[in-house]
Amino acid sequence: MGYVVGQDIGYSNLKIAFGTSDGEMTTVIRPAGAAPKEHFGSRFDGKKQDDFLHVNVNGQEFVAGVSTDRAEMWERSLHADYAKTDSYKALFHAGLLLTGQKEIDLLVTGLPVSQFQDEALREDLRKRFTGEHKVTAKRTVNVKDVMVVAQPIGGLLDYVNLVDDGPEEDRITDEHRILVVDPGFYSLDWVLVSNGQLQRQSSGTSLKASSVLLE
């Protein structure tokens, strides 16, 4: 029985699911805002900011898991190198902190399809997420193993798990051809699964996503 964590670090939201591999999963969704502590002001009434998650990023204190408009003089990341930014690392640490665990057997995370198809980018993220992480001054979390998937696959796996004990006609087999579309804030991603395999030539990423529509 291992402890498993799923993290989807998006441009708008941080979504995590965690629990033992043979038990129920807890799910949490937080906004994907993250910036150094000094970019956040205090409340007008003097009360504590109780929705702040304080995490360590390379020795600097960050606030993570808040709305992107809460940080002053700090722009949100909207580019392909998002996964290499300090804000992304802060959200990763926030996700680990929210699990309340000190050791995780398997962490599953995703990349946009175009980045997932780059083996070097997949391996770089896997290596960075594996091992010990000093998420706060007092807490270190050890991640034993990491699996990187194409982001839309998470929705498909959730559906497979949901219908596993349901009617036979609802279950997915290798005979099915499945298109999964994941409309995000920065990118629109899609995957085609056929014969139980991700069809790389029919899967991809478009940057004409929600952020473009809102401009």
Label every PLM stretch briefly.
Residues 1-178, 197-210, 215:
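Nucleotide/phosphate-binding catalytic cleft detector across ATP-hydrolyzing
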